[in-house]
Amino acid sequence: MGVQGLVGEAVDRIGGEPISARMARKAPIKHLDPTLVVVTLLLSAFGILMVFTATANNESFLTRQLVYAFIGIVVLVGVGFVDYRHLKGLSPLIYSLTLVMLIAVLTPLGYVQKGASRWINLGSFQAQPSELAKIAVIITLAAFLAERKGEVNAAAVAVCMALVTVPGVLIYLEPDLGTMMVFVALTGALLLVGGAKIRHFMTLGVLGLVAIVVVLQAGLLQDYQIQRITAFLDPTPDVRSEGWNVAQATIAIASGGARGKGLRGENTQTSLQFVPEQHTDFIFTAVGEQLGFLGAATLLGLFALLIWRALRIAGMSRDLFGTLIATGIACLWAFQVFVNVGMTMGIMPITGIPLPFISYGGSSLLTNYVAVGLLLNVHMRRFL
């Protein structure tokens, strides 16, 4: 190396630290992931539009979803600028507060709708703690596994299962089978990346099968949950009740064709409101019917790009905690998209899992914005 190179290196390392690292520490915003931001905004706009059309152009739903999006963006910015590594020490507090909220739902503070107690009344709005619990589970498991630094034994796996089981039982009591399924997927993904062995997954698989048999034999599922499973297996005999949802959703998507019937299409499953809960659980049917195969494919393409960015950030993180957070978020989105879209197409049972950024609902949208904020946080601090 010449004299000029030696001088340059010395200048760059004034104070014992590369200038580039000091600049990154002072201005992490320079390392923002623009692709993730753009995809998030596109999905949000897509969702607001579909909520408006799926509710027969009801301005009340439109206004609320716009308010939720604005609040979500504010929260995203806040989450993005607080170093995510502080969350490791705060994970016990986050976990405890989540349990308190889940317990509150089961008390008189809870708001019951259609036989389920999943919400807490906040004036004219309702909060759904089970949605925010998804992020809490990711942070809690990520913090625990990161401390093990890839050395995961049977005892560590048991602790992870216990950490998930407690909120899982509370959510079962609401009841909310869909979120319980999400917890299972998150636990599996985080254990895999965190260092669990194949034998651990084999043991968990056997225990899972035993648990399913016990649940079915003991009659622990609600009648409507059993009906949804049977309707999924064969919707034809049950087409007047639970099978109606699947049948109408399939008709709506199939009738959209390649280009769809348009956002203002008349005499459609959407405009005639044949599909129940179309602005929430079944909103993908509105996408398929109004925008057709091309619109649905575009939406799924945006989801694929979103999940890819999350996985890329997981690979770029400088620590295991950041990798686990990003992996959990990627799994969260991938699982929810797969189940929700599969549910509307009749290849998955109806579970009430929302479509990220698209389904109507403040708690779901806020949860997804928090997830994006965490990803941006990990990405911006990958050099620190």
Q: How should these model regions be labeled?
A:
Residues 1-23, 336-384:
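A juxtamembrane structural motif centered on a specific transmembrane helix
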Residues 24-40:
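N-terminal membrane topogenic signal
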Residues 36-247, 285-345, 370-374:
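Hydrophobic alpha-helical transmembrane segments of multi-pass inner membrane proteins, especially
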Residues 123-133, 173-175, 257, 261-262, ...:
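Glycine/serine-rich anion-binding loops at beta->alpha junctions
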Residues 182-183, 264-271, 302, 344-352, ...:
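Re-entrant/interfacial helical elements at transmembrane boundaries that shape
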Residues 244-251, 278-282:
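Short hydrophobic, aromatic-rich alpha-helical segments embedded in or entering the lipid bilayer
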Residues 247-254, 259-263:
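Extracytoplasmic/periplasmic regions of membrane proteins
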Residues 258-291, 321:
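Long extracytoplasmic/lumenal interhelical loops at the membrane interface
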